[in-house]
Amino acid sequence: MLASSVYNFFKEKLKETDHNYFEIGVYFGDGVHELAKDFPDKKIYCVDPFIEDGFTVLDSNIEKGQILNSQRENALKLFGECSNIIFHETTSQQFLRNLTKQQINEFNVSHVFIDGDHSYDGASNDYVLAMKLIANKKGVIVFDDTDLPGVGQAIEVFKRTYPSRITSEFHGVDPRVVVFEIGNV
């Protein structure tokens, strides 16, 4: 779920680039919808299977592994209002497996928000996907829910895996968020 502080951060960053945005885990879709309205000339890509990962049970009242129907319905309604939203209803793992070099070039993504599967494996997959999408460009990757053990552990591995690409790291956007600026190759 895109918090307003994170949305405002991306709003400022996207003004500075010709590249597009990608969100992993849209929940109700409000953040993606707002970005799409604010940036009608940009493509706003997103992926979400609408399956409860066990970390939002208190908010969703849905058991782990079950479909998040109300979130799905809300997101699809909002996405229908913006022709620049390109939504993929699948897991980020499946999306990454099927991602082609041609799609990476066509998507032209430089900014990625990771708020999907909050497990270590899920967050790890998501940073690999983010780096593939950014490719050789400069970019920004924002992780949400960094206080969750799986996400925090994945971030530590991310930092060890890509030290030459990470040009800065900061935590000032939101207490549960970490921002990484990615340098070009």
Give residue spans per PLM region:
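Conserved SAM-binding loop and adjacent beta-strand
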Residues: 1-6
